[in-house]
C-alpha cells in the first residue's frame, strides 16, 4: 500500500482517558437530544440555517474563496444565482452540504459516491471539472516571510489516485463494519 490507511490501530491511539470520557458523554446525551429536538424544532431549523451559512463561509475561506456576508447568505439560502467563479464554488459546496445533511444515513464512503459528491461540488462551475480524479500531479506549498516556497503537503500522484481512494474506502468500511472502534473516533 502506498499510504497507511489503518483505521484499526491508528484510531485506537487516540483513546486517551479524556477522549474516552468525551465520547461516553456524547453517547449519554444522544438520547436526551431526541427529546430536545422534538420540543424545539423551529429554533433548531433557524440554528441549522445559520450553521450552514457559517460553515459554508468558513470552509470556502480556507480555500481562498470569499464573498460578502450578504451574498453568502443569499447563495446558501438559494435566493441568488452565482455571479462568478467564487460564487459558483460556494453554490456547489451548498449543494453537497445539503446532500450530506439530508442523506447522511444512506451515504456510504465508496469511490463512486466520492466522485458524485465531487461532481456536485463543481456543478455550477465551467468546464466539467468535477466528478473525475485529477490528471496531473500537484503540491500544496506555503511561502515563508522571506518569500521561499516549501512543500506543505504532497498529495498522492495522479496515476495512483484512483487506487488510493479504492484502498482508503475499503479500509475505512472494513473498520466501520468490524465495529472495534467507536464510530466517533473512526470518522476522520
Placement of each model-derived feature along the sequence:
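FIC/Doc superfamily catalytic core
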Residues: 1-188
Amino acid at each position: 500500500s502506498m499510504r497507511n490507511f489503518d483505521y484499526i490501530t491508528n484510531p485506537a491511539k487516540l483513546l486517551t482517558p479524556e477522549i474516552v470520557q468525551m465520547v461516553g458523554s456524547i453517547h449519554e446525551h444522544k438520547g436526551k437530544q431526541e427529546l430536545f429536538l422534538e420540543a424545539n424544532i423551529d429554533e433548531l431549523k433557524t440554528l441549522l440555517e445559520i450553521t450552514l451559512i457559517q460553515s459554508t463561509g468558513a470552509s470556502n475561506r480556507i480555500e481562498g474563496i470569499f464573498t460578502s456576508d450578504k451574498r453568502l447568505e443569499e447563495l446558501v439560502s438559494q435566493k441568488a444565482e452565482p455571479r462568478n467563479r467564487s460564487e459558483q464554488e460556494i453554490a456547489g459546496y451548498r449543494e453537497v452540504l445539503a446532500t450530506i445533511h439530508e442523506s447522511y444515513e444512506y451515504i456510504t464512503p465508496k469511490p463512486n459516491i466520492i466522485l458524485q459528491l465531487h461532481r456536485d461540488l463543481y456543478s455550477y462551475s465551467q468546464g466539467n471539472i468535477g466528478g473525475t480524479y485529477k490528471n496531473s500531479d500537484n503540491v500544496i506549498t506555503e511561502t515563508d516571510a522571506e518569500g521561499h516556497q516549501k512543500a506543505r503537503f504532497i498529495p498522492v500522484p495522479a496515476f495512483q489516485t484512483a487506487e488510493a481512494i479504492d484502498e482508503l474506502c475499503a479500509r475505512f468500511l472494513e473498520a466501520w463494519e468490524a465495529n472495534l472502534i467507536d464510530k466517533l473516533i473512526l470518522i476522520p
